[in-house]
Amino acid sequence: MSEAVTRIHVGGTAGTDPYEVLVGRQLLGELAGLIGDRVKRVAVVHPEALAETGEALRADLAEQGYEAVAIQVPNAEEAKTVEVAAYCWKALGQSGFTRTDVIVGVGGGATTDLAGFVAATWLRGVRWIAVPTTVLGMVDAAVGGKTGINTAEGKNLVGAFHPPAGVLCDLAALDSLPVNDYVSGLAEIIKAGFIADPAILELIEADPQAARTPAGPHTAELIERSIKVKAEVVSGDLKESGLREILNYGHTLAHAIEKNERYKWRHGAAVSVGMHFAAELGRLAGRLDDATADRHRTVLESVGLPLHYRYDQWPKLLETMKVDKKSRGDLLRFIVLDGLAKPTVLEGPDPAVLLAAYGEVGE
């Protein structure tokens, strides 16, 4: 039986239904309720690292009367390729998967990105449920409806807006998460603090070491606050036509770093460097005060997130950023802060200012 559950409402926009994000412990008992009793088949997409979890979930669903199949995919970003998506499509076809059936994505952010993309493209869209097992997956990837895969040209360049029918954030899954993976997810939580909810930063600053562990006293509150920030934003702007862009704070440089590292860097580590860069860019552009810019470094460093990347890689990173999804024509666009919790767009910054900002990041 599940314990106390926090339910966070994500409002639907034109053409999409609202859904709930459930946060608590021992939540898998809630899954059948989200799937529904009119569904015949369920496909559980899971990474190799969660083979036992995926099979146990498949068996449990089968016991409840569903025709359940487990689809194992590579770990992390290696799953986000068109070849892996095609493998999933083949498995769905062989299972006789119809438009009334449901996909369940179990794993980190990369797995839920893939599962959502497969759901968006199979039969032009089937329902799916996210069961994120990492901090990053809970506070970012599984909430909001952005799904996608990577290409040789960049991260998440092929995808669809396809919100889940529900999200189960079982905090018990974090207990066995490697510390580096847990800390990586804190970058997205810290991002939420800077763009919208400074109370998040205060909770972390009060005890940075406690924030580094799922056993910390504020773990549930940090995750719930971060999800609420994203839920509020995406409820008003599903397809990133305006407000939702603020969620990309730190991500323009981060995605370029990830591509440059062939997706071997943790997403949160790249976002941390990206936020440091965005803070310096905001400062040098005359938008952000020194105290808030400096606060980026102290908060990120206090939980063990990186601040720097190789200086000599700037030309390659700049070229990658030019094909970023947020760019408009040849115009580079960055999310910066006008102050704490005051995100805005900086369009076409002076190349010299960009280089100077990266000079604070490069090593």
Swiss-Prot record:
Alphabetized UniProt keyword annotations: Amino-acid biosynthesis, Aromatic amino acid biosynthesis, Cobalt, Cytoplasm, Lyase, Metal-binding, NAD, Nucleotide-binding, Zinc
Concerning CDD domains, the annotation shows: DHQS
Q: In which pathway does it act?
A: Metabolic intermediate biosynthesis; chorismate biosynthesis; chorismate from D-erythrose 4-phosphate and phosphoenolpyruvate: step 2/7
Reaction(s) catalysed (UniProt annotation): 7-phospho-2-dehydro-3-deoxy-D-arabino-heptonate = 3-dehydroquinate + phosphate
The Enzyme Commission number assigned here is: 4.2.3.4
Q: SUPFAM superfamilies recorded for this chain? A: Dehydroquinate synthase-like (SSF56796)
Positions contributing to Zn(2+) binding: E188, H251, H267
Query: What are the GO MF terms of this UniProt record?
Result: 3-dehydroquinate synthase activity; metal ion binding; nucleotide binding
Q: Which GO terms describe its biological process?
A: amino acid biosynthetic process; aromatic amino acid family biosynthetic process; chorismate biosynthetic process
Matching Pfam families = DHQ_synthase, DHQS_C
| Assigned GO CC terms | cytoplasm
The cofactor named in the record is:
NAD(+); Co(2+); Zn(2+)
Q: How is the cofactor bound?
A: Binds 1 divalent metal cation per subunit. Can use either Co(2+) or Zn(2+).
Q: What class of enzyme is it?
A: lyase
Which residues are recorded as binding NAD(+)?
G109, A110, T111, T112, D113, T133, T134, K146, K155
HAMAP family attached to this UniProt entry: DHQ_synthase
UniProt cross-references to NCBIfam families, sorted A to Z: aroB (TIGR01357)
What is the role of this chain?
Catalyzes the conversion of 3-deoxy-D-arabino-heptulosonate 7-phosphate (DAHP) to dehydroquinate (DHQ).
Q: Which family does it belong to?
A: Belongs to the sugar phosphate cyclases superfamily. Dehydroquinate synthase family.
Indicate what this protein is called per its UniProt record. Answer: 3-dehydroquinate synthase
Gene that this sequence comes from: aroB
